[in-house]
């Protein structure tokens, strides 16, 4: 579960490395987000000459969470870090590569382009 002010790693090649959550989208009283949710983030650390600069505000999709996720078949899945993929307004990724594994729930929620770019779908 990720809340406002959480720091997240970026799992794509947009140039951002660390982002901070500004707002959880999906309702006025939504306090936390998990895998597959969209959040508004601010770029905290970025590489020089990258697509994104420090201080930019963008939308991102959560692809990994240390909190974990319970699936309908009873299994639990947890990751080693909290990570996001930066997306455009229409839900397509801004980068051209996605690093590390992502959860299968990303594909089930309709983000097929992100799932196809990922190295591994768990």
Swiss-Prot record:
Keywords: Ribonucleoprotein, Ribosomal protein, RNA-binding, rRNA-binding
MF-aspect GO terms: large ribosomal subunit rRNA binding; structural constituent of ribosome
PROSITE patterns, per the entry: RIBOSOMAL_L14
Positions of disulphide bridges: none
Keyword Ribonucleoprotein: yes
GO cellular component term, pick one: cytosolic large ribosomal subunit
Domain of life: Bacteria
Entry's Gene Ontology BP terms: translation
Coiled coil regions in record: none
CDD domains given in the database record: Ribosomal_uL14 (cd00337)
UniProt entry tagged with the keyword rRNA-binding: yes
Role summary: Binds to 23S rRNA. Forms part of two intersubunit bridges in the 70S ribosome.
Subunit structure comment from the entry: Part of the 50S ribosomal subunit. Forms a cluster with proteins L3 and L19. In the 70S ribosome, L14 and L19 interact and together make contacts with the 16S rRNA in bridges B5 and B8.
Entries under PANTHER family matching the protein: 50S/60S RIBOSOMAL PROTEIN L14/L23, LARGE RIBOSOMAL SUBUNIT PROTEIN UL14M
Family listed: Belongs to the universal ribosomal protein uL14 family.
Annotated protein name in UniProt: Large ribosomal subunit protein uL14
Organism the protein comes from: Mesomycoplasma hyopneumoniae (strain 7448) (Mycoplasma hyopneumoniae)
Classification of source organism: Bacteria, Bacillati, Mycoplasmatota, Mycoplasmoidales, Metamycoplasmataceae
């Amino acid at each position: 579960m990720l809340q406002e002010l959480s720091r997240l790693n970026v799992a794509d090649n947009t140039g951002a490395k660390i982002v901070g959550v500004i707002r959880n989208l999906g309702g006025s009283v939504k306090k936390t987000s998990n895998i597959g949710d969209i959040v508004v983030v601010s770029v905290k650390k970025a590489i020089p000459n990258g697509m994104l600069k420090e201080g930019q505000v963008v939308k991102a999709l959560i692809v990994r969470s240390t909190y974990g996720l319970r699936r309908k078949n009873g299994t639990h899945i947890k990751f080693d870090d909290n990570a996001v993929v930066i997306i455009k307004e229409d839900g397509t990724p801004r980068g051209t590569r996605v690093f590390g594994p992502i959860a299968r729930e990303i594909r089930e929620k309709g983000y097929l382009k992100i799932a196809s770019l990922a190295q591994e779908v768990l």
